[in-house]
Swiss-Prot record:
The lineage of its organism: Viruses, Duplodnaviria, Heunggongvirae, Peploviricota, Herviviricetes. The record marks D492, D494 as: Essential for primase activity. It is an enzyme of class 2 (transferase). Its EC number is 2.7.7.-. It comes from Human herpesvirus 7 (strain JI) (HHV-7). GO terms for molecular function: DNA-directed RNA polymerase activity; zinc ion binding. GO terms for cellular component: host cell nucleus. This is DNA primase. It is found in: Host nucleus. One of its GO terms (biological process) is bidirectional double-stranded viral DNA replication.
Length: 861
C-alpha cells in the first residue's frame, strides 16, 4: 500500500476535522515523503508522539488512489487541495479509524448517525484527541531540526525512522546515514516555504537510495546489536568473576564502556561497518566481528584481572621500599607497662602550647625552636636529640620531667565534658586492668574461638569517673605520632549494616577467620619469613549498644537466641597486627596505603565477600584518617562516652580471639599476647633493636589521591591538570600582579592568599557568617603549613592567637581553634576551602570541619 506522511501550513488538527466532516476549506495537504507501492488506497499519516513496537506513524484518513491520481501530485511535487481529498475520501476505511473512539464519547443509540455528523458534533473531542496523539508541525523548520538539515540526511533519516519500524533512535539513524554515504547533499534552508520544501523531498535523487539504505541500516543494526551484546557479555563475565563493592561495580561498568567506546575506537568501528558498494545488501557489516568486545579484553579486562587477583596483584602492583642498616639510631617508646607505680603527667589542651614554649625557652641556643601546638609537643616526645651539660646528655624532653630521657607515648583520656592528655614512662597495666585475675579463669583446653571468647571475662563499669587515675584505664586513646617508628599495624574498621542483617555467632567468627586469612596472606607477602600458621592477629569488637533489646521486630525467638551481635547501624572492629621484631614502618602514608591494600584484598576473597555482602553495605571499610599526626584512636578494652549526658559508658572494645592453628595447643600464650599493651599500640615497645625500616608501601595502579578506577579514567581521557603553582601565577597575572618572577614557592602561595584568595573568602564570610564569627576575621595573618594549606592567625595588639570555635559558642569560649585555608585544583580553576579543628568533644575532638568554600573563575590556559 502507498503511505505518505503529510503536513499543513495551518493547524493540522482543524484541517483533518474539516476533511472528516467533508467541509471544504482552502487549506492544502503537503505530502512530505512517500513509501510507494501499487495499491487501491493512499494512506495519509502523521507521526505519533508515542510509539509502540517502533511504529511511529498512524493513518488519519484514507483516499482512493485512482480517483485522487496521487502519483500526479508526487511526480510534480504539488500540494493537494482539501476539497480534492474530500471528493476522493475512502469513507468506509476512514470511518473505521475513528468510529470506536467517537462512539465511546456519545450517548448510546448513536450508531446510526452519519459519520460526518458524528465528527461535527464531537469536533472538540477529536481536535483534542489529534493534538494529544500526533506531532503537528506546520513548517519545514521542525523537520529540518529533527531529521537533518542536508537533503540526504533529512530524507534517509526520515524514511527509515518513520517507515521501517526498526528499534533505532533518530540519532542512531543519523549515524547510519553517515556510515552509508559521505555525500549528504546541499543544505535545506529553514526559511523555505512548505511548497519549496516538498519540491525538494519529492524530487530528490536520494529517494532512489531509500531501499538500499534501509537494507544497510537493518544490517548495521543487527551488527551493532551483536557487537554490544558481546561487549555486555565480556563486561559481565569479569564482573561476575570478582566481588566488587556496589560503587566500584558502577565505576567499573562506566569505565568498561568508556574504554570500549573510546572516540578513536568508535570511529574505527564506524569505518569498518560503513556501507561497502562492492558487497550485496545482505552481506554488509560482516567484517571483523566483535572488535569492540575483543579490544576491551586487551585494553582493560586483562589489566583488571591482574589487579583483582591476589597473587598477581602483589607481584605487579604492590611496591614496598625497605632499608636495612644495623646502625639505625631509631628509638621506640621506652615505656614500662609492669611498673609498681604510674609515672605519668596529666595536662589539658591549653597547657600543651605552654609546655612547648617552656622547652623552647630552656633549650634556646641549644635546640631549634619547635612550633607551638600538639604536633610540636609530639615532636618533643619523640625527639632523641641531646646536648651535653656537665658531661651528661640532656634531651629537650627532660625539661618536661627529669626522668623522660627517652621517647614516650601520649594518650588522650576522655573525661566528663573535657579531654585530658597524659604522657609518661611507666604504668601498671596488668594490675589496673585486672588481667592477672582474668588469666586464672581461662579454660584448661582450647575448644574453639567462639567458646574462648565467650568464657573470657572482663570486669565492666557503667559510669564515668571524675578521677583521672580510673579513667586512664577506661577511656584512653593513643595519639598517633609520625615522628616515631610504627611497630604494630592498627586497623580501624567500620562495617555499615543492612537493615535486615542478623549477625549470628557462626557468621561473625567465620567473617573474622576469613579476614585473618586475607590479612595474614598479605602480611606474609610483605614479610616472607613469618609463619602464618603461628603469627598472631588480634581482633577487638565494639560491644553492642543495645543488648537489652536484641532484635525488636520481624524475627523469631530462635533468631534472637542465636544472635551474637545486635548492633543496628554498624559493626566496629579494631585489628592489630604486630610488625615482626626488628622491623618498623616509618611515616603515616605507608599505613594509609596498607589500609587501602587490605581493603582491596578483602574484596578478592570470594567467601568473605559472600558474608559481607549478605549483612553490610560494601565500601571502604578501613579508616585511613587515623594515621595523621595528632589523631587519636581508642585502645582495645576501652569504652566510648555517651555524648548526650557525658556520664555513661558504652561500646567497649572487647577482645575477639582468633587463635592461629599452631598456637591452639598453647592458646593461653596467645591470650597473653592480646592483653599486652605493647601489641595494641601504634608505637608499642618491642624487644629487638630496629634494623630494618619500611618507608614506602605503594599501589602502583593507585596514586595517593586516586582509586584504581579513577586512575584508569584519567588515563582514558588524558586530562592533564594544571599545578597549583601554575594557576596561582596565572591568577596573579590576570589580576595585574606582573612582578612574580622573583617569588619563591612559599612566597607565591602567600602572595596569592593575601591578594586574591583571602579577600574573596572574607567577603563571603561577612555576608553569610554570624557576627560573632565574622568579626574574628577582621585582622588576620597567614602561616604556610604545606604546599596546599595556609593557617590563619588572629593579630591582636601585636600578638598572634588562634580562634574561638567558628561553629559553636562553647563554655569558656577559649581561643584554641586552629583555622586553615586549603587550596585544591579543579581543572583550570582553584577551589578555596575554609576549615578548622576544634578540640572539644561536641566538635568531634579535633576532626576537620569545613565551613565555607569559594570557587575562582576558570582560566584560559
Amino acid at each position: 500500500m502507498t503511505i505518505t506522511v503529510f503536513a499543513t501550513e495551518y493547524d493540522p488538527a482543524h484541517v483533518i476535522v474539516n476533511i472528516l466532516c467533508k467541509n471544504p476549506s482552502e487549506h492544502l495537504i503537503f505530502p512530505i515523503i512517500v513509501k510507494y507501492k501499487p495499491s487501491k488506497n493512499v494512506y495519509f499519516c502523521m507521526q505519533t508522539q508515542k510509539c509502540k513496537f517502533s511504529k511511529r506513524i498512524e493513518t488519519v484518513f484514507v483516499c482512493d488512489a485512482e480517483s485522487l491520481n496521487f502519483s500526479y501530485y508526487v511526480k510534480n511535487a504539488l500540494p493537494i487541495k482539501s476539497e480534492d481529498i474530500i471528493h476522493c475520501l475512502n469513507t468506509e476505511e476512514t470511518e473505521n479509524l475513528y468510529k470506536d473512539f467517537l462512539l465511546s464519547h456519545v450517548p448510546e443509540g448513536s450508531e446510526n448517525i452519519e459519520f460526518k455528523s458524528l465528527v461535527f458534533f464531537c469536533k472538540t473531542i477529536i481536535i483534542k484527541h489529534l493534538t494529544n496523539k500526533y506531532l503537528l508541525p506546520t513548517s519545514p523548520f521542525w523537520f529540518l531540526s529533527t531529521y537533518g538539515q542536508t537533503e540526504g540526511m533529512l530524507l534517509l533519516t526520515m524514511y527509515y525512522y518513520l517507515f521501517e519500524e526498526q528499534k533505532s533512535t533518530i540519532a542512531t539513524t543519523k549515524n547510519y546515514v553517515q556510515c552509508f554515504t559521505d555525500k549528504l547533499g546541499d543544505m535545506v534552508f529553514t526559511y523555505s516555504s512548505m511548497s519549496e520544501f516538498i519540491n525538494i523531498t519529492l524530487k530528490s535523487n536520494y529517494r532512489k537510495k531509500f531501499v538500499s539504505f534501509s537494507e544497510y541500516a537493518k544490517q548495521k543494526n543487527i551488527r551493532d546489536r551483536k557487537e554490544f551484546l558481546y561487549l555486555d557479555k565480556q563486561i559481565d563475565i569479569f564482573r561476575n568473576s570478582v566481588h566488587l563493592t556496589n560503587s566500584f561495580r558502577v565505576h567499573y561498568i562506566y569505565i568498561a564502556y568508556s574504554t570500549a567506546l573510546e572516540k578513536n575506537k568508535f570511529i574505527k568501528y564506524s569505518q569498518l561497518t560503513s556501507y561497502d558498494p562492492t558487497r550485496s545488501d545482505t552481506s554488509q557489516c560482516q567484517e571483523n566481528m566483535y572488535i569492540l568486545g575483543n579490544s576491551l579484553h586487551s585494553d582493560l579486562i586483562s589489566i583488571m584481572k591482574q589487579y583483582f587477583n591476589e597473587d598477581s596483584y602483589f607481584q605487579n602492583y604492590v611496591e614496598i621500599k625497605r632499608m636495612l642498616n644495623n646502625k639505625f639510631q631509631m628509638q621506640q617508646y621506652v615505656y614500662d607497662i609492669n611498673s609498681n607505680r604510674n609515672i605519668m603527667l596529666v595536662i589539658n589542651s591549653d597547657q600543651i602550647s605552654k609546655m612547648v614554649n617552656k622547652c623552647n625557652k630552656h633549650g634556646e641556643g641549644y635546640f631549634t625552636p619547635i612550633k607551638l601546638g600538639l604536633q610540636g609537643f609530639l615532636k618533643i616526645l619523640a625527639s632523641n636529640k641531646s646536648i651535653l651539660i656537665d658531661g651528661k646528655p640532656v634531651t629537650r624532653r627532660q625539661y618536661l620531667h627529669d626522668q623522660f630521657s627517652n621517647p614516650i607515648p601520649m594518650f588522650r583520656v576522655q573525661m566528663s565534658y573535657k579531654n585530658l592528655y597524659c604522657f609518661g614512662s611507666a604504668e601498671s597495666w596488668y594490675k589496673n586492668m585486672g588481667f592477672d585475675q582474668v588469666m586464672q579463669f581461662l579454660p584448661n583446653e582450647y575448644i574453639s574461638d567462639e567458646s574462648l571468647t565467650s568464657t573470657f571475662w572482663l570486669q565492666d563499669t557503667t559510669f564515668l569517673s571524675d578521677e583521672i587515675e580510673k579513667q586512664f584505664y577506661v577511656t584512653r586513646h593513643e595519639i598517633f605520632n609520625e615522628y616515631l617508628p610504627v611497630t604494630n599495624y592498627i586497623g580501624d574498621l567500620d562495617l555499615p549494616l543492612q537493615d535486615s542483617a542478623i549477625i549470628t555467632e557462626s557468621l561473625f567468627f567465620s567473617m573474622c577467620k576469613l579476614m585473618r586469612n586475607v590479612l595474614i596472606n598479605a602480611w606474609q607477602k610483605i614479610f616472607p619469613f613469618i609463619d602464618k600458621d603461628a603469627y598472631p592477629i588480634f581482633f577487638f569488637k565494639t560491644t553492642c549498644s543495645n543488648p537489652e533489646n536484641p532484635l525488636n521486630h520481624n524475627v523469631c525467638y530462635n533468631e534472637v537466641e542465636t544472635a551474637f551481635c545486635v548492633c543496628k547501624k554498624k559493626i566496629g572492629l579494631r585489628i592489630a597486627i604486630p610488625i615482626p621484631q626488628g622491623t618498623a614502618i616509618i611515616g603515616s602514608e605507608p599505613l594509609k596505603q596498607l589500609s587501602k591494600i587490605f581493603n582491596h584484598l578483602m574484596c578478592l576473597n570470594h567467601d568473605l565477600m559472600q558474608i559481607l555482602n549478605s549483612v553490610i553495605f560494601p565500601g571502604e571499610c578501613f579508616d585511613t584518617g587515623i594515621y595523621n599526626t595528632g589523631r587519636c584512636l581508642r585502645l582495645g578494652f576501652m569504652y566510648k562516652v555517651d555524648e548526650e549526658n557525658n556520664r555513661f559508658l558504652y561500646g567497649r572494645l572487647k577482645p575477639i580471639f582468633i587463635v592461629p592453628e599452631k598456637m591452639k595447643k598453647n592458646f593461653q600464650d596467645f591470650v597473653s599476647m592480646q592483653l599486652d599493651l605493647n601489641n595494641i599500640l601504634h608505637h608499642g615497645t618491642k624487644d629487638q633493636t630496629i634494623t630494618e625500616i619500611i618507608y614506602s608501601i605503594f599501589d602502583k595502579a593507585c596514586p595517593t589521591e586516586f582509586s584504581f578506577i579513577d586512575s584508569r579514567t584519567k588515563q582514558l581521557y588524558h586530562r592533564k591538570q594544571s599545578s597549583l603553582e601554575t594557576l596561582c601565577l596565572k591568577y596573579l597575572h590576570v589580576n595585574g600582579f606582573s612582578e612574580t618572577s622573583c617569588l619563591s614557592r612559599d612566597d607565591l602561595l602567600m602572595t596569592f592568599t593575601r591578594s586574591i584568595a583571602w579577600p574573596q573568602m572574607l567577603k563571603k564570610n561577612i555576608q553569610h557568617c554570624e557576627a560573632r564569627t565574622a568579626t574574628q576575621f577582621q585582622h588576620v595573618t597567614f602561616l604556610k603549613i604545606d604546599h596546599k594549606n595556609i593557617q590563619l592567625k588572629k593579630l591582636q595588639n601585636g600578638k598572634l592567637s588562634d580562634f574561638s570555635c567558628l561553629t559553636r559558642n562553647h563554655k569558656g569560649n577559649r581561643e584554641n581553634v586552629l583555622v586553615y585555608l586549603e587550596f585544591k585544583v579543579d581543572n583550570n580553576r582553584i577551589l578555596i576551602i575554609l576549615w578548622s579543628k576544634c578540640f572539644t568533644t561536641k566538635c568531634k575532638s579535633n576532626s576537620k570541619q569545613v565551613h565555607s568554600s569559594v570557587v575562582l573563575d576558570s582560566l584560559n590556559m
